[in-house]
């Protein structure tokens, strides 16, 4: 009997200890949140004057930055400071007009941004990760850092559309899918073979028509990628951001 009583007492003590753990963890987490918010505000204050947070251009535009987590083709977090989608101000203004027009034709629909401004250092990591592909094939998916990408200047973005219920439209291939089925140039062929459905192609065309109406150019090998202009034009008018620090360092006047 004494052994049973002792066992019950020990069990109760263990349960009591276990019940205290979540409470302490919750208290610790609650203290971390304000610090992160404060850090984010500090970075916003240092944002390069050429850039703008996309959601400041239009509050209905949503973001889900794929490279702030490990849920991407590299399987690792690539951004340490970036947690918002940044674009050149004139590019963001055009994107806001895309969202406005989309709402008029499809009430409740919203743009969802997967990536926008991307430093050259991150571009290099992506390029190196695909070293199993020949450079010609690799360049169809990731621009060679030596040539620069419009992402590196805040003049390109990766995106899709959310329906009125907040679900991404079915595009027949996921973001960062390197298979040919993700290539816009092969849509008609895959439609004929049944590998893409009419609805999937229709969804792609909806995004394409909305973006092209504001002068954005789709990459022929990625249904989600749009450039604001040509590479040559971008190089002539926009700053190149080589690191995340470049994005959050306000230039000093001479």
Regions inferred by a protein language model and the residue ranges of each:
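C-terminal motif of bacterial Sec signal peptides marking the signal peptidase cleavage site
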Residues: 14-16
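Extracytoplasmic cell-surface/polysaccharide-interacting catalytic and binding patches
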Residues: 18-116, 129, 133-221, 230-254
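Beta-rich nucleic-acid/ligand-interaction surfaces
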Residues: 120-122, 126, 226-233
């Amino acid at each position: 009997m004494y052994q049973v009583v002792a066992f019950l007492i020990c069990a109760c003590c263990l349960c009591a200890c276990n019940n205290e753990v979540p409470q302490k963890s919750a208290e610790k987490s609650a203290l971390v949140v304000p610090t992160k918010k404060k850090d984010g505000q500090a970075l916003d204050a240092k944002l390069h004057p050429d850039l703008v947070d996309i959601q400041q251009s239009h509050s209905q535009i949503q973001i889900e930055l794929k490279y702030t987590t490990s849920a991407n083709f590299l399987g690792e977090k690539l951004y340490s400071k970036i947690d918002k989608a940044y674009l050149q101000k004139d590019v963001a203004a055009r994107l806001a007009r895309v969202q406005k027009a989309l709402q008029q034709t499809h009430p409740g629909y919203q743009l969802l941004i997967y990536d926008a401004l991307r430093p050259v250092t991150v571009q290099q990591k992506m390029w190196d990760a695909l070293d199993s592909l020949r450079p010609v094939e690799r360049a169809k998916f990731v621009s060679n850092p030596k040539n620069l990408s419009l992402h590196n200047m805040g003049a390109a973005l990766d995106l899709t559309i959310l329906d009125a219920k907040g679900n991404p439209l079915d595009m027949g291939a996921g973001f960062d899918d390197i298979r040919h089925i993700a290539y816009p140039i092969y849509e008609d062929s895959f439609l004929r073979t049944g590998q893409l459905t009419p609805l999937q192609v229709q969804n792609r065309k909806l995004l394409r028509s909305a973006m092209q109406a504001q002068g954005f150019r789709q990459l022929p090998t990625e249904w989600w990628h749009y450039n604001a202009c040509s590479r040559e034009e971008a190089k002539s008018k926009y700053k190149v951001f080589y690191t995340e620090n470049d994005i959050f360092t306000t230039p000093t006047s001479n």
